[in-house]
Every structure is written in structure tokens, then in C-alpha cells.
Amino acid sequence: MLGSPKLTARQQQILDLIQNAITLTGSPPTRAEIATELGFRSANAAEEHLQALARKGAIELVSGTSRGIRLKSEALRSINESRSKQFPLSLPGLSQLMLPLIGRVAAGSPILAQEHIDQTYYVESSLFQRKPDYLLKVRGMSMRDAGIMDGDLLAVQSTRDAKNGQIVVARLGDEVTVKRFRRTKDLIELCPENPDYQIIVVEPGEPFEIEGLAVGLIRNTMLM
């Protein structure tokens, strides 16, 4: 795609809303959430704008999931370039990050151990507002309704802390999983975004730690 897509003010507003949601929560908003945020009468109005954005090449819509919205890399670059003209000190220029791609994680060893690194990718930093530390290849469809599909590359920022509702990379015993984090008074729940999968309940005393937060999503084909 040559140049930036010509968007209406409303389309740009929705595109910004999608990017902010992905940055803050690790997943795009639903149609209903977009409608509520922007004062639309129904989710159908949001869907019409999303279809227009998809036709202009700014996003990709994934069928069969309420959060099936993916930003195209070109759209992200155009957003950051336009904002940098207004706020030149608040956003970095286009530069590349060198991110290790983590494959399967062996039990008991650090997630960034050398033996877990399949390869290294150079990725434009403009794809993220929060700097990731590594990419994790998604396995399975447990987060399908958050727009995270099998084979996607999840950009992860290393941290031990998470807020309710954020998508995390968590280690539970010998397993590493990607789920939505929820803490209640007595326990922790790791929630899938697919009704075919069950919530993982972390009981007190069970070996558990957060490895990182999802800060972005990249389709594997974008890095070819």
C-alpha cells in the first residue's frame, strides 16, 4: 500500500481507539465497546465504520470473534507519523527493535533462556507504544475471541505485575500460558477468550508467576 489511507475524522477516531485499546489491554475493543465509547446507538454503526477501515487497508477483520480486529503495520506507521508532527517529543521516530522469538519453554527455566530462542526478528518500534522485550509464538485458540490466533506472534513486555483484565503470559507450574488475568479476594483466575476452554483457577500456594504483559500482536506473515 502506497502512502497513508485517507480516513475521515470519525474513521481516524476509531483507528486511534483500536490502537489505544491494544496498547492498554493487549486486545482490540468489541463493536459494542466502540459504540459505547463513541456514542453510537448500536454496534452495527461501529461495524459499518470498521468495514470502511478494512476496505481502506487500515485494519483487517477476522470473522468468528467479537474482537477480531487487527491493525495493519502501515496504518500504525501513519498514525505515529501524523501524531509526531503535532507532538514531536512524545513519540519516538521509526526505529527497529531486535526481539527474540520464544518457542517452547522448558519446565523450570527462565523464559528468555538462550535455549528457548528460536530466532531473532527486527521489528519497527512504531508498532508498539509500550516497548516489548520478546515475541512469543501463540499456540492454540484459547484466546480466539481477543483476536489472538494460533501461530500469531504476541509481543510481550517482561513484568511480574498485572492489573485485572490485562492479557498476560503466566507460568503455572511447568506450563506457560497466555490468558486474561483476574484476581479475586482469595485466588487468581486465568481466563480464556474462547468458550471451548475452561478458566484456570490458581489456588493459594500453587506455583504461579506472571512472566509478562501482552503489548501487541503481530501476524507471522508480517515478518516474512
From Swiss-Prot:
Keywords: Autocatalytic cleavage, DNA damage, DNA repair, DNA replication, DNA-binding, Hydrolase, Repressor, SOS response, Transcription, Transcription regulation. GO terms for molecular function: DNA binding; serine-type endopeptidase activity. The active site is at 142 (for autocatalytic cleavage activity), 179 (for autocatalytic cleavage activity). It holds the Pfam family LexA_DNA_bind. SUPFAM superfamilies: LexA/Signal peptidase (SSF51306), Winged helix' DNA-binding domain (SSF46785). GO terms for biological process: DNA repair; DNA replication; negative regulation of DNA-templated transcription; proteolysis; SOS response. It catalyses: Hydrolysis of Ala-|-Gly bond in repressor LexA. Its EC number is 3.4.21.88. Residues 31-51 bind DNA. It is an enzyme of class 3 (hydrolase). The record marks 107-108 as: Cleavage. Represses a number of genes involved in the response to DNA damage (SOS response), including recA and lexA. In the presence of single-stranded DNA, RecA interacts with LexA causing an autocatalytic cleavage which disrupts the DNA-binding part of LexA, leading to derepression of the SOS regulon and eventually DNA repair. HAMAP family: LexA (MF_00015). Belongs to the peptidase S24 family. Homodimer. This is LexA repressor. It comes from Albidiferax ferrireducens (strain ATCC BAA-621 / DSM 15236 / T118) (Rhodoferax ferrireducens).
